Regions:
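Conserved nucleotide-sugar donor-binding subdomain of glycosyltransferases
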Residues: 66-98, 105-106
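A short, glycine/small-residue-rich beta-strand->loop->alpha-helix junction that serves as a flexible
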Residues: 8-20, 203-207
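Conserved nucleotide-sugar phosphate-binding/catalytic loop shared by glycosyltransferases and other
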Residues: 9-10, 29-80
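A nucleotide-sugar donor-handling region in carbohydrate enzymes
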Residues: 130, 135-203, 231
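C-terminal alpha-helical cap of glycosyltransferases
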Residues: 309-312, 323-344
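Short amphipathic alpha-helix
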Residues: 15-26, 38-40
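A donor-sugar binding/catalytic signature common to diverse glycosyltransferases
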Residues: 99-103, 120, 249-292
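Donor-nucleotide binding loops and adjacent catalytic segments primarily
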Residues: 23, 181-256
């Protein structure tokens, strides 16, 4: 029997990134991790054993815009039903004392059916991918999700704000960095102004890569442009950009850089905030979560056509104030749930 089962959504790399931060904080021996896709490679690169059980549907992104969202919603629903079957077998075999899920609602559904204590980690309290007929289906799915959130022992949201009922707002959750910035820059050979371009765990960021390369060619500042292309982009780009591919220590690279340019995923934004690195975050158009994330910090999709000016402006600014890392609070809340269960 394993005491904690941790299910991490394999859609993108953001969930795996913050989940690794939490798992490192817990240092709990009787814990197993389940995910899929590029998240598995990420966990393995960071010497964390994780079981590859999920194959999520892919977003169809053309020129930076999300297409066929209704089709994706239908594929997600089928994926969710399949994940319930998979997680049900695992949970029945392992008989855990606690289930933690980072936006893997299939495992939470099974946990709540089996009356197993459960914690949800999530950025969102509802989805808004579709309108019309698709919106009606999505509304029903949101209602089901809301019931799960209400029934969870705790819901951890990595944002600042007040706690209410079972919702714990921890602030951004990122990995801790022990080295100082100068040490990391020296190890990475960051000798001049360095821009890091990161597009996560999917191929949705190719449009942003191409636009950034063209913008950097035109700026009047001598810079290095470093690409973190992730595991799914094999296309070759300009020789003016150094592609590090898929790395295990993106958090350190962001901390060491002078500017991070990225899609508007929550985890990369949070790393920028906690490490004090100025950022430019371009959302996938029609991707409600990324558009909401970007809007909160003053960006929109159309900014992709003004990258040159934004890059020059950001590179002349001082580094930002470093916000507090919420991983300690998240760890304490999880341990509190475990101790309460053990004392029952």
């Amino acid at each position: 029997m394993t005491e904690i089962l941790f299910f991490s959504s394999p859609i993108g790399l953001g969930h795996a990134t913050r989940d690794l931060a939490i798992i490192n904080q817990l240092q709990f021996k009787s814990l197993r991790v389940f995910s899929g896709s590029s998240a598995i490679e990420f966990f393995h690169k960071n010497k964390l054993e994780a079981q590859d059980i999920y194959s999520p549907p892919k977003f169809e992104v053309i020129d930076g815009k999300l297409e066929k969202s209704l089709k994706w919603l239908w594929n997600y629903y089928k994926y969710y039903k399949n994940c319930k079957e998979i997680s049900s077998k695992i949970i029945d075999e392992e008989k855990p004392k606690l289930i933690i899920s980072d936006e893997d609602f299939a495992s939470i559904a099974i946990a709540q059916e089996r009356k197993i204590p459960n914690i949800i980690i999530t950025d969102i309290l509802e989805t808004k991918f579709t309108t019309g007929f698709g919106g009606m289906i999505e509304k029903k799915m949101n209602k089901t999700m809301q019931i799960m959130l209400d029934r969870a022992n705790k819901v951890i949201i990595p944002e600042l704000g007040k706690n209410e009922n079972n919702i714990i707002r921890t602030g951004p959750i990122v990995r801790k960095i022990e080295k100082n910035r100068d040490e990391i820059r020296k190890a990475l050979n960051f000798e001049k102004k360095t821009i890091v371009l990161s597009v996560g765990g999917t191929d949705a960021g190719i449009f942003l890569i191409k636009q950034t390369i063209e913008a950097v060619k035109k700026i009047q500042i001598d810079v290095n442009l470093i690409l973190i292309s992730g595991p799914n982009i094999t296309e070759k780009f300009s020789e003016s950009i150094k592609n590090l591919g898929f790395v295990k220590n993106l958090h350190e690279i962001i901390f060491a850089s002078d500017l991070i340019i990225s899609l508007a995923g929550k985890s990369t934004i949070d790393e920028s905030i906690v490490y004090g690195t100025p950022g430019i975050f371009i959302p996938i158009k029609n991707h409600f979560e990324q558009e909401d994330n970007a809007r909160e910090i003053g960006f929109k999709f159309e900014d992709i056509f003004n990258l040159r000016n934004m890059i020059e402006q950001k590179l002349t600014q001082d580094r930002n104030h470093q916000e507090k890392n919420g991983v300690d609070i998240a760890g304490m809340e999880i341990l509190d749930t475990i101790f309460k269960k053990n004392n029952d």
